[in-house]
Amino acid sequence: MSSLQILQGTFRLSDTKTLQLPQLTLNAGDSWAFVGSNGSGKSALARALAGELPLLKGERQSQFSHITRLSFEQLQKLVSDEWQRNNTDMLGPGEDDTGRTTAEIIQDEVKDAPRCMQLAQQFGITALLDRRFKYLSTGETRKTLLCQALMSEPDLLILDEPFDGLDVASRQQLAERLASLHQSGITLVLVLNRFDEIPEFVQFAGVLADCTLAETGAKEELLQQALVAQLAHSEQLEGVQLPEPDEPSARHALPANEPRIVLNNGVVSYNDRPILNNLSWQVNPGEHWQIVGPNGAGKSTLLSLVTGDHPQGYSNDLTLFGRRRGSGETIWDIKKHIGYVSSSLHLDYRVSTTVRNVILSGYFDSIGIYQAVSDRQQKLVQQWLDILGIDKRTADAPFHSLSWGQQRLALIVRALVKHPTLLILDEPLQGLDPLNRQLIRRFVDVLISEGETQLLFVSHHAEDAPACITHRLEFVPDGGLYRYVLTKIY
């Protein structure tokens, strides 16, 4: 029986990036779905399975005789090439309508009219065979390319994002055709963006995060794992309404168009050694910033200025939430606008308590709960738990029984219950494995995009940023100091 096996595989993506596939076996007749967000490495996985990526370490062994990979990029190129014929000298004598027919596209590599007709019947596109390919709809072009791939009778077919750009009816129709292919004995691999795209017939599944195959297994068992189930739940949250704050947010007292942070030529030094050196930075309403740089660059020092904790804040031209530092404001005038989560807070949260109580403690800015909790606060926290996809059993389980990423996510929600003006996440991915990192990024995107809180996301690497980031402040080594690069993310 044919199979493809990868053991401790490291595949080259670029000079600085690799794809990690610890262990994977595809047997003849299997149907697999691999799910990952943009940048997770799922398209690289498709190429690795097809034997198109250099193997740096480990083993890749395949007994499949004919592997075919199809991607959305290939489809786009084919359509583009057909339209390009109008702008070239590829016109034949007397030809006034350039572009090949659907039948010609299907038989591009294998000329076999009876098989072409058989496949067209199987995919319901016989009426399109004489039509110019470039005039077909997205769903029709997808079926045409599948027919083209099947002309050569592959024994392993890899489809990269086959449902992308299709409407609900077209997705269902394509899934039914793929189920028929699977029943005919073809080994099938689907690479997908979302868990809810996995067709019912699929037997096995895997999850990619940070260019690592993080989990694999029988589909139903995998989808029931707590982390995977929570990631799948996050796909259903678009447009969700966040729970109200228990009391009106301090944000509402701020003028709508007033900058949240203004630092002009900021300087902080220790023993005459500059830590921040003439940094000018402004955070306007609606902006979400990533602050990125190596250890010792001054990121934490900048955060301590923003939170009002650094004594040299008074000697700088610094305005926080409309109040110039040193103008009579108290530390609490600043902190009422800020939610803060760091790995050190995570380590400090050592009290023995439940997940529910950790989130409730956000209403009191305490580690643990030492006062009465109102019925309204209990109801609001239940709404937050529902958004996180945490059931009652898990909510009332010990906080430290959750995965490290789930704990950190609970602390992020703890910081959000008051709907602060600014949420500061200081190295929120530190110490997390790829799947937990993906969990944090995904929920941060949801929670920030559906609310009005602004984000400061601090990390070592630009690629750590969640999708909601609009601007980046980068600390770049420059001699013995650092220079500052401010970028708008498009």
UniProtKB/Swiss-Prot annotation:
Disruption phenotype: Not required for synthesis of the molybdenum cofactor or for the uptake of molybdate. It comes from the Bacteria. Induction: Probably part of the modE-modF operon. This is ABC transporter ATP-binding protein ModF. It is a peripheral membrane protein. Its main location: membrane. Belongs to the ABC transporter superfamily. Residues 4-235, 261-489 form the ABC transporter domain. Pfam families: ABC_tran. One of its GO terms (cellular component) is ATP-binding cassette (ABC) transporter complex. GO terms for molecular function: ATP binding; ATP hydrolysis activity; ATPase-coupled transmembrane transporter activity. Probably not involved in the transport of molybdenum into the cell. Keywords: ATP-binding, Cell inner membrane, Cell membrane, DNA damage, DNA repair, Membrane, Nucleotide-binding, Repeat, Transport. SMART domains: AAA. ATP 2 binds at residues 293-300. One of its GO terms (biological process) is DNA repair. InterPro entries: AAA+_ATPase, ABC_transporter-like_ATP-bd, ECF_ABC_transporter_ATP-bd, P-loop_NTPase. ATP 1 binds at residues 36-43. It is found in: Cell inner membrane. PANTHER family: ABC TRANSPORTER ATP-BINDING PROTEIN MODF (PTHR43553:SF3), HEAVY METAL TRANSPORTER (PTHR43553).
